[in-house]
Each structure stands twice: as structure tokens, then as C-alpha cells.
A protein has these predicted regions:
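Surface-exposed, low-hydrophobicity beta-strand/loop segments enriched in small/polar/acidic residues
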Residues: 1-149
Length: 149
């Protein structure tokens, strides 16, 4: 009998949406909004390839959604990266078909490491904040890619 793993057909992740191309960044910014009108689920990957700064410096990466490309709501706040943190990947899912059964307050950002999975919109963007407490040019290299389903 053959190995059952040989017959597994991988499921495609979906259309790739670049929310933040891989680059070294030294300051916070908003990424470019990407239309997600025909999407009901987003698989979002944060790929941090380098953090070259002091331990007290931080990187916070967010994914925001918008119904109108004007009002932005924070849906994902990835786990905070220390300035001397190791390279790594973080993954989160937003699913419009699973909105949940409770009201979600969205007047402020989610806490670090929190996903608001039912929060969805016609537009999506990445956003990041870099704290440089040592004043010596904190630098983090990362990308954010969403796979639209």
C-alpha cells in the first residue's frame, strides 16, 4: 500500500495580496489599501526577517479593514516584536462567514497578539508602529501578505 500522504492534494491559499512588501523600515506608516470586495476570508502572514536594534525598541504590526476606504478598523494586532527579536512568522485569519455572537468594541486597536476574526471590510491594509526608545535608528525588515479566499 502506498503512503497516504502521497495522495494529499494541497489546498491553494488563495490570491496573494501584498499589504507590505518586504523592506527594512525605521518608522511607522500605513500601507496602501487593497480592495477585498470579492473576498470572504483572509489568511494573513507576517514574515519578520530581521530586527536590528536594541531590546527596548519594538515593532507592532496591524491589519486594518474598512467598509469605505476611509474609516479604518483594527482587525489584527500581531504579537509585538522586540528590537533584538529573532526572525519569525505569524499567521492570522479573518473570516466574514464567522462573525461571532458578541459585539466588538473597535474604538481602539486590539491588544498585541489579538485577532478580531469576524471584523471585515471591502478594503484591507497593513499598518505598523516602530518605537525607537534608544534613538539609534531602529530597523525591522518584514512583509505582510494576505491570501484572499
Amino acid at each position: 500500500m502506498s503512503n497516504p500522504r502521497e495522495t494529499i492534494v494541497p489546498r491553494p491559499l488563495g490570491r496573494a495580496l501584498t499589504l507590505a512588501a518586504s523592506a527594512a523600515r525605521t518608522a511607522g506608516a500605513n500601507g496602501t489599501a487593497v480592495a477585498a470586495h470579492d473576498v470572504s476570508r483572509l489568511l494573513v502572514l507576517l514574515d519578520i526577517t530581521a530586527s536590528a536594534t536594541d531590546a527596548g525598541d519594538t515593532l507592532d504590526v496591524y491589519v486594518d479593514v474598512s467598509p469605505d476606504n476611509s474609516t479604518w478598523l483594527n482587525a489584527i494586532h500581531f504579537t509585538q516584536q522586540a528590537g533584538n527579536g529573532a526572525a519569525g512568522k505569524q499567521f492570522a485569519v479573518l473570516d466574514a462567514t464567522n462573525p461571532g455572537a458578541t459585539v466588538t468594541a473597535v474604538t481602539s486597536d486590539a491588544a498585541a497578539g489579538v485577532v478580531r476574526p469576524g471584523l471585515f471590510g471591502a478594503y484591507v491594509r497593513a499598518r505598523w508602529a516602530i518605537a525607537d526608545v534608544g534613538g539609534d535608528d531602529a530597523s525591522h525588515t518584514f512583509s505582510v501578505t494576505a491570501y484572499a479566499q
